[in-house]
Curated annotation (Swiss-Prot):
Entry's localization field: Cytoplasm
The protein's name in its UniProt record: Isocitrate dehydrogenase kinase/phosphatase
Source organism per UniProt: Pseudomonas fluorescens (strain ATCC BAA-477 / NRRL B-23932 / Pf-5)
Domain of life, source organism: Bacteria
Gene Ontology annotations for the cellular component aspect, listed alphabetically: cytoplasm
PANTHER family: ISOCITRATE DEHYDROGENASE KINASE_PHOSPHATASE, PTHR39559
Keywords assigned: ATP-binding, Cytoplasm, Glyoxylate bypass, Hydrolase, Kinase, Nucleotide-binding, Protein phosphatase, Serine/threonine-protein kinase, Transferase, Tricarboxylic acid cycle
GO biological process: glucose metabolic process; glyoxylate cycle; tricarboxylic acid cycle
Its biological purpose: Bifunctional enzyme which can phosphorylate or dephosphorylate isocitrate dehydrogenase (IDH) on a specific serine residue. This is a regulatory mechanism which enables bacteria to bypass the Krebs cycle via the glyoxylate shunt in response to the source of carbon. When bacteria are grown on glucose, IDH is fully active and unphosphorylated, but when grown on acetate or ethanol, the activity of IDH declines drastically concomitant with its phosphorylation.
GO molecular function: [isocitrate dehydrogenase (NADP+)] kinase activity; AMP binding; ATP binding; phosphoprotein phosphatase activity; protein serine/threonine kinase activity
Positions annotated to bind ATP: 317-323, 338
Amino acid sequence: MSQSWPAADIARMILDGFDDYREHFRQITDGARQRFEQAQWQQAQKASAARINLYEEKVGETVARLHQAFSTESLMDVSQWPLVKSAYISLIDLRFDDELSETWYNSIFCGLFSHDLISDGCMFIHTTRPSLRRARAAQTRSYKPQGELATMLEQVFADYRFSEDYADLPGDLRRLEAQLRENLPDWVCKDPELTLELFSSVLYRNKGAYLVGRIFTHEEQWPLVIPLLHREGRGIQIDALITDEADVSIIFSFTRSYFMVDVPVPAEFIGFLKRILPGKHIAELYTSIGFYKHGKSEFYRALINHLASTDDRFIMAPGVRGMVMSVFTLPGFNTVFKIIKDRFSPSKNVDRATVIEKYRLVKSVDRVGRMADTQEFADFRFPLSKFDPACLEELLEVAPSTVAVEGQTVLIRHCWTERRMTPLNLYLEHANEAQVREALEDYGLAIKQLAAANIFPGDMLLKNFGVTRHGRVVFYDYDEICFLTEANFRHIPAPRTPEDEMASEPWYSIGPHDVFPEEFPPFLFADAGQRKLFDQLHGELYNADYWKGLQEAIRAGKVIDVFPYRRQGLEDE
């Protein structure tokens, strides 16, 4: 290999691009505190979308600078890129965000070269970062009550102050102490070794701020999340205290927008979260704080490790076959893989470009805990032996432009991944009476909360919603979604004549964006009992005026409250 080849210069320019991205990422993230203090909710939504789009923008800029700075002959000689990787490793070894910089390098490589040139020699398919890092400055604050919970809580909130005052801190602290004693066994509150540990930085998302940490003794630990709200005109309010692991897991769910939080050493913060949420994969934790590209890297590493270490094979996902997407899964890996079919059902008035646009839209909007996050992949390559023959046959039949067999390898040219859930229609088939009621209640709430966040699902059939392991109903089929304000909700006109009333087809004109909520009941529910129950629970969804009222509120700039936790115990009635 030629010593004059500019490996070190290319590596430095890639890292300079990463530094530029990180600086802009930090600027947006650091503004979250001020947006919370000043109740700038619409600005918070815009900042969230801007931060998501930032990564691809900066990758594009860096790739363009590389093309400008180096000749095509030098830059595009892939055989020399192991030298670039080696030079890059030496540049990132002392960084506090070294694992993120590896993912950035991978993105630049993929922006330059086709995916069939991917190899661990040229990029970081496997990380070079040590699993155990050097000790660094503490990112947490620790408190020991030593029998005085009230005094400890006073100290906590003396440390976590904002430019806006707490509305009623003494009252909040009394309620907080009472809730803590109610949530934990009595012996824990009296344990002299009881310790409360909180991450030093506050996490921000939508209208909330969150203190995140844990409570522990020598024998046991509990996660701890304290959400704060800014009540405009009243001040900051402590809204809840959460110590249940399942409830904390929901706060960090794949259905939520990404937190904004200052994390000087990302790997250490993820390790901290992993201690309090051991059931969460680190891919999901990185994604939850906005590092979704690195979450994607960790997901891919987990996937290839699973395939290499198990006999699992891809099968078609259970449920009704999609009219636009074909969905397959690995039984032992909690994910579904979705590809766009070459031909859609005639009833679907969309094309491939529109479907891609809709799925990418979901990434940038507030999912309010009711839409599954997705990761988009290009040129997945899997061993042929890892596919059930029936699964592969179906994929090749419905999407031959996307799926191809190359020798002993299956190429998936484009797909999305989502968390696997139980389709709501299948869940209801096996649910008892109480479970049916609970699921339909949550199904209606999901539709309402999405609508209040300016999202209209379009196709609201039960099969397009899933039930998570925590029992929450989540929307996951996005080919017909639109902003609620784009839909035209109408009442069905009264018939003009007896002939109108008996007509098999609508006698009135219907525009492309028209929606008639009165038509929902028979469309959504084949089961008459479920239809009647849903009418009792959420009958207003059948009224066009309900939807129009939401549209008016959204156009007036109202940002709704959708809380990722049960609000009980702290706020006075």
